[in-house]
């Protein structure tokens, strides 16, 4: 799904002490079938090699924008990312997570098909040995369900796509 008319999605990744996992996260995001997105990486004062990894990815792909700030916690990093975001839609991904290649495509399509302001997806836990613990099966196509705001009040920051004007501050 790569059309110039597709709206820009801002993917915000707060980064702190995840040197071991960060490349997997970034590779999964840059492999998305939905191509019109910016990837905002916010280094929250990480003392390991995360900043160098972020610089390498930014040098290789113009969609990657990197920022460095004093440690203030994950909420502070997310808020900083929101201030920098230019997209019509906002998505958060934790830096020790990875996503399926059609993640952004499916989330955006679900929002458009149902005319909603928020799309939320499930996830699978993966052990340290990278074996799926399987709380949700992999799918070839997403299953779309519609919930009221009251039914899904506690939507997590990760695993969701929402319009920028509805992006909550933390």
PLM regions: where:
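Nucleotide-sugar donor-binding/catalytic module of glycosyltransferases
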Residues: 1-170
